[in-house]
Regions:
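Extracytoplasmic substrate-binding proteins
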Residues: 133, 152-244, 268
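Short, solvent-exposed loop/turn and secondary-structure capping segments
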Residues: 101-105, 167-170, 248-250
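A short, structured surface patch at a secondary-structure boundary
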Residues: 51, 56-149, 155-160
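Alpha-helical, coiled-coil/dimerization segments enriched in small aliphatic residues
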Residues: 246-269
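Short, structured coil segments at secondary-structure junctions
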Residues: 106, 173-174, 261
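Bacterial Sec-exported substrate-binding components of ABC uptake systems
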Residues: 17-98, 207-236
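Bacterial Sec-dependent N-terminal signal peptides
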Residues: 1-23
Length: 269
């Protein structure tokens, strides 16, 4: 059972954030992503194109981003969103991504967060209670638009949902919305590999590559250990929002994480 606990701590921290990873970056070349299926990253001389595939509609695109280095005036196609990188002031709606930004050593780029009371990250809580520190932007489902505008943020990182009807006023204030659909990947390592995208956003590409390599090695090692364990435990996640209790599907990244950790998940099928 010790293996199960360790694998949760080592991987869920990054999700809530064998083969050697090799990334070849040349003009017009795509970064090699081994596990993530809902994202492509293409490097060109002038900018980086990041295409997010729509996990709810096969064959369609959820969002396209053109990452342009700060201080340059590159023109980009009009079929996507231009994002100036590295981000210096971002608003983050989820604990998973705020924690990852801290692990990528870019904590000062967190200017605001949503659902502060649930974001149990010591540095975030400390800075949020300091004058001029991180701003609480309210509930993620009903954010304080005025506070977000006042922050003059470079981008907002949030989670998209199927049939959500869009983001309301957030789409009208001129701040790029980064749709963090990593949770829709069908493997834990696929979800974790999105950190390479977030690394590009924060100017921490090398840190993200190094961190992912560590996660990949640890995950495979611990998963192998767990598969030989004679002890299993039943797993029942608890995420209740209002009157709704959300449970991950058995083939979701979290459901497969339970399987790799040698846990028995009631909704695995």
């Amino acid at each position: 059972m010790r293996q199960l606990i360790v694998i949760f701590l080592s991987v869920l921290t990054l999700l809530s954030c064998g083969n050697t990873h090799k990334q070849q970056v040349v003009k017009g070349s795509q970064s090699e992503l081994q596990y993530a299926h809902n994202i492509t990253i293409e490097h060109t001389k002038d900018y980086v194109t990041v295409r997010l595939l729509n996990p709810w509609k096969e064959g369609s695109t959820l969002h396209t981003y053109y990452l342009v280095k700060r201080g340059t005036q590159e023109n980009v196609p009009d079929d996507g969103t231009k994002v100036v990188v590295p981000l210096q002031r971002s608003v983050i709606f989820t604990t998973a991504h705020a924690n990852l930004v801290e692990m990528l050593k870019a904590p000062r780029a967190i200017a605001g967060v949503a659902d502060l009371r649930y974001m149990i990250i010591p540095d975030v809580q400390r800075r949020a209670h300091r004058k001029g520190g991180i701003v609480d932007c309210g509930d993620a489902m009903k954010p304080d638009i005025e506070r977000i505008i006042d922050l003059r943020a470079d981008a907002i990182l949030l989670s998209p949902f199927e049939n959500s009807g869009g983001y309301g006023r957030l789409e009208q204030i001129g701040i790029p919305l980064i749709e963090c659909a990593d949770y829709m990947e069908t493997s834990a390592l696929g979800r974790a590999e999105w950190m390479k995208f977030y690394g590009l956003l924060y100017g921490k590409e090398h840190e993200a590559d190094s961190l992912f390599t560590i996660v990949e090695q640890n995950y495979k090692s611990l998963s192998k250990q767990a598969s030989h364990s004679k002890i299993t435990r039943s797993v029942l996640p608890d995420r209740k929002v209002g009157a709704v209790w959300y449970l991950p599907g058995g083939e979701s990244s979290i459901g497969l994480l339970y399987k790799d950790a040698h846990g028995r998940y009631a909704y695995s099928n």
